[in-house]
């Protein structure tokens, strides 16, 4: 008889995993396999069950039924500590760091002494191309850098299974490239990677195998090369929505309330005029935004975009310069007064500064209106508002009083957008609006943002997704090391040019529009 070589068992095999919450089935007999040295991408709409499945594998949640095996050995009663010992590490979509501890302390937290090797940590950081200051507090980092710290925690634990939940959501293309390079090094060492993402080009670039989840089950699974982009999108789309056109824009235009569209329609004055503004992380910033205009703000992480946005909203003090909103100087105003004047900010970190996680959905969606109008409890009105946004953005939830923290990350982001829109913005500053949002929902959000602009609301659009910036913005300001490196519009506004300018190159390629600064030579002039 010919000698038969036994096939080694998969690194990870999940069979028949099911899970319910309060009688609602969220996972339906899931089978999932990960081989050594493989990237297995996991796709699915918000609420499809991806995060729940990964939390079960990582020992955070127990399954109701099913078996988890590593290298052919069953794993019973998994806890996060046991999962770490087995080499399973989940890098969450929302960084979960100790804000008051240093970066180094966060990376080494609870590591056994034999693994807490500072030389190894330095080498891993070098391999990733990271230039993090290990002595600063983790809470002072941008979200993208916090994400890299989370990944470092997994790498320091010699993880054999690395679960990455939307790891590139807040990373620039250069940072994404470095991360992928490090992942490929890990693959050569036999590490298996579960890669959760909504970015189909990244999945094609990195993943060997792809599984698509829909409504708690596996709708499609196989080699990535065997499926077209359309195959994946169709597999993600619920049957009830196939062939249906989004009505987000129509619903938004039907929303009641004074959107100030009439008062701005005939005005030629900018909604906001920022002159020579300086503050923590940026200097000598000047620009204006007209009613109905979407102004993109691009740059690499650390360029000062979020610091600028927070200063405009009054969360940080300005050291010099002026901010004029509808001909009123608001530079010294408190945040509450800026909100009352119509300046609304959708923050980058929804869990830390955007939503009240333990409060009901219906209360959250009207929270800024509460702050502005003192309407602390109008249940019927709140329910009606939430229902409109549920239909417009396809927000998935069970009941009105459900706490926000029970929603998936993408649905939390949609709720935050709804909350900001309901505050009746005159100027809306949007920081990473599609972070953690699936492919099918992005188009809804884009249409919604455009429909707001059509109602003469001025929009400052901040995103690390440069293709998204080009798609959405009428003009783009590119920041580099806290200053405006140039302004782009028209045909000059493309990903390649923005990328070069974001890394400090000076390109005079803007098409002037109504006094807009046209080159890097005009730093400090009105853009």
From Swiss-Prot:
Instruction: Show the SMART domains listed in the entry.
Output: AAA
CDD domains, from UniProt? ABC_Carb_Monos_I (cd03216), ABC_Carb_Monos_II (cd03215)
Q: Which family does it belong to?
A: Belongs to the ABC transporter superfamily. AI-2 autoinducer porter (TC 3.A.1.2.8) family.
Reaction catalyzed = ATP + H2O + (2R,4S)-2-methyl-2,3,3,4-tetrahydroxytetrahydrofuran-[AI-2-binding protein]Side 1 = ADP + phosphate + (2R,4S)-2-methyl-2,3,3,4-tetrahydroxytetrahydrofuranSide 2 + [AI-2-binding protein]Side 1
Q: What gene makes this protein?
A: lsrA
The lineage, from the top, is:
Bacteria, Pseudomonadati, Pseudomonadota, Gammaproteobacteria, Enterobacterales
Q: Which UniProt keywords apply?
A: ATP-binding, Cell inner membrane, Cell membrane, Membrane, Nucleotide-binding, Repeat, Translocase, Transport
Q: Specify the protein name.
A: Autoinducer 2 import ATP-binding protein LsrA
Organism, per UniProt? Yersinia pseudotuberculosis serotype O:1b (strain IP 31758)
Q: Where is this region: Disordered?
A: 508-527
Where does this one sit in the cell? Answer: Cell inner membrane
- Tell me, in a sentence or two, what this protein's role is: Part of the ABC transporter complex LsrABCD involved in autoinducer 2 (AI-2) import. Responsible for energy coupling to the transport system.
The annotated topology with respect to the bilayer is: Peripheral membrane protein
Q: Which GO terms describe its molecular function?
A: ATP binding; ATP hydrolysis activity
